[in-house]
Amino acid sequence: MDSERDVRAQLQRAGQDHLLRFYADLAPEARAALLAELASLEADALREHCQRAAAAGALAPGPLPDLAARLQPLPPERVGSAIRCDQETRLRWEEEGFRQISLNKVAVLLLAGGQGTRLGVTYPKGMYQVGLPSQKTLYQLQAERIRRVQQLADQRQGTHCTVPWYIMTSEFTLGPTIKFFKEHDFFHLDPTNVVLFEQRMLPAVTFEGKAILERKDKVAMAPDGNGGLYCALADHQILEDMKQRGVEFVHVYCVDNILVRLADPVFIGFCVLQGADCGAKVVEKAYPEEPVGVVCQVDGVPQVVEYSEISPEIAGQLGADGGLLYNAGNICNHFFTRGFLDVVTREFEPLLRLHVAMKKVPYVDEEGNLVKPLRPNGIKMEKFVFDVFQFAKNFVAFEVCREEEFSPLKNDDTADRDNPSTCRRALLAQHYRWALQAGARFLDVHGVQLTEQSGMLPNGDPPAICEISPLVSYSGEGLEMYLQGRQLQSPFILDEDQARLLRPQDC
């Protein structure tokens, strides 16, 4: 272990020796832990990180200069659509996706390094329940979608396939996530096919360029953003693991989208048939000022431009069809070939831009007292997963229906949008639509049949509560055999047990 003298000299070179100012107050165990943490922060890298953070924090936020002359929508030939395509084309994409899944060439990779702080909880977001009748968590919904898509591929191709699930966690979420999965028997997935790994952490920095102590014996650290994926892949030999399994295509997504379709065969098939090395699902922006990044081209290169970087004038520009010109909203749902990820980790990762996040970072003051600031006092530097789009040789975007595939969980219920209630309603509304399309009808509390025209209730809930397990249907398929011609009382849960009861005897 590095000595106090060595660590202090290292910190002095970095201009960060204040991190040891409470060393004399600490017990032996706390001293050892602090020295170990500080020794891992290499002096030159620490100095550069703190200087870059302070410099970036001093820049005025706002629209990028000269963006109007540099910005273009993606060329039409680079964009596919699950909404506007004909049925034959969609089936061709889906069939190719299922073929690749059946050949064990597809993996999913979950970005799960963030805590549920904005939700008012201290545990990982994936462990959160939004209040579904089944009380399923985000992790369970996602695990069951993996099981179902494997089952569908096997049924179509006559195989026994595996979709490995890679989960990138952080120092905050790794332990709780492992414990949660073990407690729930990995949701009946083979544990050898669930690979958890940890992203790097970076010190939070004051506006003056000083690393922050959150306790006398602990530096305030934060995950290096979802773009930390590329270092983490290299740190933990994840690409080597994928190669050994025969994985060629990776579906990367964020933990907080309750409607996410893991290993979506339509998306996978589209990207593969296009020969893409990198792809992004997008949804049409709801309105010009919607706070989502835009997938577009800057100087002829594909990338995501954050909503804060686009002026209102550009955001409101209309295209020839009368819709928004820059309407491809990014939803953190991406396709990569393993070969592309390998090149990124070896060559391009150091070129990724660092993004600034101003945060309220708890700290200890000069007397060693804990302070919880009421306004941002620190800078956390992050990399974004989508900043590799610029390095793709064949980038594509794939438009999907927001109501079917995107409802993120960002805030608690005091917020107007992206909260547990909006997520719950989005999923239940989807399942209600699926049930109607399968030929079911619902009864209200008085036993009166609801009409198909029955609108959403004043609170945003569907007219009847219906939840369909991902183990029964992945995207609305196969429900007719259970629901055709049936009258259902709300609330109705179609899980595997209920499906067995409703299944016709001759099936």
Swiss-Prot record:
Residue span of motif Substrate binding: 111-114, 306-307
Keyword Manganese: no
Residues at which substrate binds: 226, 410
Covalent S-S links between cysteines: none
SUPFAM superfamilies: Nucleotide-diphospho-sugar transferases
UniProt KW keywords: Nucleotidyltransferase, Transferase
Entry GO MF terms: uridylyltransferase activity
InterPro entries xrefs: Nucleotide-diphossugar_trans, UDP-sugar_pyrophosphorylase, UDPGP_fam
Binding site for UTP: 111-114, 125, 199, 225, 256, 380
EC assignment: 2.7.7.-
Similarity comment: Belongs to the UDPGP type 1 family.
UniProt name for this protein: UDP-N-acetylhexosamine pyrophosphorylase-like protein 1
Annotated source species: Mus musculus (Mouse)
Gene that produces this protein: Uap1l1
